[in-house]
Every structure is written in C-alpha cells, then in structure tokens.
Amino acid sequence: MNSLPPAEGLAAVIAEAMYQVVHAAQFGRARDALIGQYSARKREEAASPLVRHGAKYFSQNDEDGILLEILRRLGLASGVFAELGVGNGLENNSLILLMHGWKGIWLGGEALAFEVPARGPLHFQQAWITRENCRALVAQGLAALDQQHVDVLSVDVDGNDLYVLRELLAARYSPRVVVVEYNGKFPPPVRWTMPYDPEHIWDGTDYSGASLQALADMLQEFGYRLVACNLTGSNAFFVRVADAGKFADVPADVGALFMKAEYIVMHPGHQTSPKTIASFLATQA
C-alpha cells in the first residue's frame, strides 16, 4: 500500500499548485489586457470610421456594432434580413436585427440549438446551400414571411460565398447592405476565389471563400462599394453606390479598408444560451 507523503511535503505540493493557479490567472489577465490594448489601437487606426463602432452582442466578433452603425446612417430602423449560414443560431450577423424588431430568413445546413415558433418574425430552413438552390431557398423564405424584398443580406457558407452571393444578386435581390465572409489571408490587390464545389466542407484551412478584392470586384458589377471590414478580418460590409454619400468619410480604396485575419483580437464574452433566444422568440410568436 502506498503511504501518504509527510505533511510538510504535502504542504509544499499544495503551495506549488496554488502558486501555479495564481500565476496562470495573473498571466491570463495580463494577456487579456494586452489584447485589449492592441484591439483598441487597431480599431482607432482603422481606415473606416465604421470599425470604431464595432461591438459584439450576438455576432462572432464585432460585426453587430458595425452593422448597426451602417443601418443608422441609412435610416433603416426595421426591415427584412436574409442570412445564409447561421450555424446553430446562437452566433451570427442577423440575430441582433431580430432583437431590434426585424423579420428575416435563416438558412443553413446545421440544426438550430432552439425551436423557432411556426408563427413569428423568423423563418428557418435547414438546407445545404449551393449556387443551384440558393435562389429558391430565399424565395421560399420570403414567401413564408409574406415579404418581397431583402434589406440586409449576409452570406457565410464557409467556401462558396462568392458564387452564392453572385447568384442572389443576379436574381435581382438588391439589399441595402451586404455582409459577406472573406478570406483574410489574401490582401488586395490579390484576386483569389476557391473553385466552385457544391459539396465543399470547410476543413479548417485557408482553402475557403474568396479574397476581399475578388468580392469587391464582383459586388462593384452589381452597384455596391466596400465600406468596412471587421476587426478580425472575417467579414466585409458593402452598401449600394447610390448610398455612398452617407459614407463620404470612408475611403474608397479596398486596400486601405482591408483587415487581415487576426482572430485573437476579440474577447468572446459570455456564451449565448439557447434559452435566451428561445425565450425571446416565444414573446414574438
């Protein structure tokens, strides 16, 4: 039978363990402080003033605050959104709009972490999104809500984003705001797009999506201009050229607005509970 160590030896082990715990906590606080300082400096130095409004409520990073400021400038207090690629529904770009009284469509291949009431402001359809079916899926969602147009369109399908977005714009959906994930590995003027693959599943590498320049070029063909990229270099925000006057303080150069991929610059905050979203939707049904 193993014998217990002497009391003084056990005390030393406990003291060392406590030291390591305290040291780890101090290191964590110091790390968070440095990240916070770096993020604040990066936000202030951003070419687009919209980035300084960045804030995380339900988005993955700071997209919520940027989107709300864009909508404020456009004078859009309510409307209709369509988001393609919503994960389990707990973290995306349009949940904040739902909280502000908007109606909208969610499409994605993953089941939601909560139930969506049959009658309410949100229509969800679980489906694998491709270039071939995205038009029909959005049309079905709008019909379910008895709506005819989309004010905010967000696309994050982890691969075929440019192709799906181009298909929807070609279908004459002309949202006031487009939010789309870009590949922050490729700075402008690099033009790169993943070859179209309707069966593509993101493997966690940089083989995904399209460069910011490729997306900006495509969206320009449909009358849109870039106004911001979020702090982590994940999502780009576009508005109609007709609304450019409301963003006169934003430079037109895509390279100046580009944010490289830096996912460490945002603190995750409190995790969203499915109960929070479910309880809100229950009040809207």
Predicted segments, located by residue:
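Membrane-proximal basic amphipathic "stem/tether" segments
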Residues: 1-51, 285
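Short, hydrophobic/amphipathic alpha-helical patches that form generic packing surfaces
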Residues: 32-33, 69, 96, 218
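General secondary-structure edge motif
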Residues: 46-50, 77, 199
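Short amphipathic alpha-helical segments, especially helix-boundary/capping motifs
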Residues: 39-46, 69, 188-193
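Conserved acidic-Pro-Pro-aromatic motif
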Residues: 80-83, 96, 116, 122, ...
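SAM cofactor-binding core of SAM-dependent methyltransferases
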Residues: 51-144, 148-155, 184-187, 269
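Short, functional N-terminal and low-complexity linear motifs
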Residues: 30-38, 104-106, 181-186
